[in-house]
UniProtKB/Swiss-Prot annotation:
Name of the encoding gene: argS
SMART domains, per the entry: Arg_tRNA_synt_N, DALR_1
Protein name in UniProt: Arginine--tRNA ligase
EC number: 6.1.1.19
Reaction(s) this enzyme catalyzes, per UniProt: tRNA(Arg) + L-arginine + ATP = L-arginyl-tRNA(Arg) + AMP + diphosphate
Any one annotated GO CC term: cytoplasm
GO biological process: arginyl-tRNA aminoacylation
Organism: Lactobacillus acidophilus (strain ATCC 700396 / NCK56 / N2 / NCFM)
Domain of life: Bacteria
PANTHER family assigned to the protein according to its UniProt record, in alphabetical order: ARGININE--TRNA LIGASE, CYTOPLASMIC (PTHR11956:SF5), ARGINYL-TRNA SYNTHETASE (PTHR11956)
Similarity-based family: Belongs to the class-I aminoacyl-tRNA synthetase family.
Length: 561
């Protein structure tokens, strides 16, 4: 049962405000003794020409509900205290009946392409790619839970001027045998060497531009090298995605749209939107903005041209209701240009394109950079995390079966959870030892809490006890705190989906884990009495919601640790 919705309905029966406005105004009192929800009457003072405290008193006196133990005015607030027994009983009933589908809802429907991950060919995946990959994956899972059909697109960086540079680098320093032996690292070293040498030899940049022009013109040697670079890179990417448990519905990268750009350029011309500026073909963005470049002065296309073609193609292919681009915050202006140009072309669906930006992962406070070579490779971080998790598991539970699988779930899950617990737009520092700790605000802490709940259920089964299916007669403060969180889960899912913000779910999971651990420490769950079934029902419901929270984040939940 949604108690907040009932508060909204009750208040709505007494005041002339839209329900959406009331919902936004409802607060959680900081002092639990003041109740569970509060409605501030300040907003009504101007229109009703009354003291807010009097308004609150009048509202409270006219409200009554069996689901609330107390509804009273406290100063200018109407405070609602939930009937603890009813919240616990209704919440446990819902969670145990719906299981992993608890929190499913219909906020919308239709296709939602999610442009995510999108590493560059011929460069190893770095920690810099982690954010887009795991944020996009979590958003996809959450959007599906609220009714949409997500389509995960890996818009590979498999075209662009960097390939001219890479081909030039390979022609200068490349060795076919080295590339066959260790393809992606060899190509990466050529790329780093190119930029280092180009600092003292600007002619190299010209060579890179010439090779990219050849690639665009279909030169056989350039095309053959490009295909080879793409093939070996994609194979390596898929290995890492498998580690992360991430799959894609499409790997159509920039190159897929190479033959779809000229029709867009022609369309812009036909609609009178394209004109020349300093030798380039541009679209005006307004008086105070620089124009959006569509074709550079040397005749080559740019990233925006392909994104316009990709957006048009995706609309025709998927008929989307929203399209998300999970791309770093530094690309914000690019997406302003993309949406503005599409709107100028007459496409109102551009309003449903959303840039989902995120901050940087730093190490020691410094930004990671591929070009200069001070890069942290993602596969190495995942290996180190798994090894660190395994070491701790062997110390805590040396007899645990399937240690390798559990260590994988905990290590990889720790890296993913650490990323997602941070607000999407925040920059954060990455310290592996902190990330894989079993205590504190970490993924392993949430996983361990779930494993603890599962252990309680196994011990109960060995005693011949099982969770109650209908009699939930518990009413202690520890149980109420847990049940209150469980009751909030559908609202948490909705908020995460609406804001494209996985951290909402990660923070919820941490809070629920902490409250359950307090319950575990203060209540003798396995005492044989007439409430044991109800206590076990709370344990089972907690495990269901923790497991589902972790799943929505793309993290596995081992039953033993």
């Amino acid at each position: 049962m949604d108690f907040k919705n009932e508060v909204v309905d009750l208040v709505s029966s007494q005041v002339d405000l839209p329900k959406e406005k009331i919902t936004a105004l409802i607060e959680r009192p900081k002092n639990a003794k003041m109740g569970d929800y509060a409605f501030p009457a300040f907003i009504l003072a101007k229109t009703m020409h009354k003291n807010p405290a009097i308004i609150a008193k009048d509202i409270a006196e006219n409200l009554n509900s069996d689901n609330f133990a107390n509804i009273q005015a406290v100063g200018p607030y109407v405070n609602f205290a939930i009937d603890h027994e009813k919240l616990i009983a209704s919440t446990l009933k819902d969670v145990l009946a719906e299981k992993e589908h608890y929190g499913d809802q219909k906020l919308g429907e239709g296709n939602v392409p999610i442009d995510m991950s999108s590493p560059n060919i011929a460069k190893p995946m770095s920690m810099g790619h982690l954010r887009s990959t795991v944020i996009g994956n979590s958003i996809a899972k959450t959007m599906k839970k609220v009714g949409y059909t997500p389509i995960k697109i890996n818009y590979l960086g498999d075209y662009g001027t960097q390939f001219g540079k890479l081909i030039a680098a390979y022609k200068h320093w490349g060795n076919e045998e080295d590339v066959k032996k260790d393809p992606i690292m060899s190509l990466f070293h050529y790329y780093v060497k190119f930029h280092k040498e180009a600092e003292n030899n600007p002619e190299l940049d010209n060579e890179g531009r010439e090779w990219f022009k050849k690639l665009e013109d279909g030169d056989p040697e350039a095309v053959e090298l490009w295909k080879w670079f793409r093939e070996v890179s994609l194979k390596d990417f898929k290995r890492i995605y498998k580690e992360l448990g991430v799959t894609f519905d499409s790997y159509n990268g920039e190159a897929f749209f190479n033959d779809k750009m000229q029709p867009v350029i022609d369309e812009l011309k036909d609609k009178g939107l394209l004109h020349e500026s300093r030798g380039a073909q541009v679209v005006d963005m307004g008086e105070d903005e620089n124009p959006a470049i569509i074709v550079k002065s040397d005749g080559t296309s740019i990233y925006l041209t392909r994104d316009l073609a990709a957006a048009e193609w995706r609309m025709k292919e998927y008929n989307f209701v929203k399209m998300l681009y999970v791309v770093g915050n530094e690309q914000a202006q690019h997406f302003v240009e993309l949406k503005t140009v599409l709107k100028k072309m007459g496409y109102d669906w551009a309003d449903e394109i959303h840039h989902v930006p995120f901050g940087l992962i730093t190490q020691g406070g410094k930004k990671l950079s591929t070009r200069k070579g001070n890069v942290v490779f993602l596969d190495q971080v995942l290996r180190d995390a798994v090894n660190l998790a395994k070491k701790q598991i062997q110390e805590k539970n040396p007899d645990l079966a399937d240690q390798d699988q559990v260590a994988h779930d905990v290590g990889v899950g720790a890296v993913v959870f650490h990323d997602l617990k941070n607000d999407r737009l925040d920059n954060f520092d990455f310290d592996l030892d902190e990330v894989v700790r079993f205590e504190g605000d970490t993924g392993p802490y949430v996983q361990y809490t779930n494993a603890r709940a599962q252990s309680v259920l196994r011990k109960a089964a060995a005693m011949g006890e099982k969770p109650s299916e209908g009699d939930f007669n518990i009413n202690d403060d520890w149980a109420f705190a847990v049940a209150k969180d469980l009751a909030d889960f559908p609202r948490i899912v909705a908020r995460s989906a609406e804001k494209f913000e996985p951290s909402v779910i990660a923070k919820f999971a941490l809070d629920l884990a902490k409250k359950f651990n307090k319950y575990y420490a203060n209540v003798k769950i396995l005492t044989k009495d007439d409430q044991i079934g109800a206590r076990l029902a709370l344990v089972q419901a907690t495990s269901i919601v923790l497991t589902e929270s972790l799943r929505l984040l793309g993290v596995n939940a081992p039953k033993e640790m």
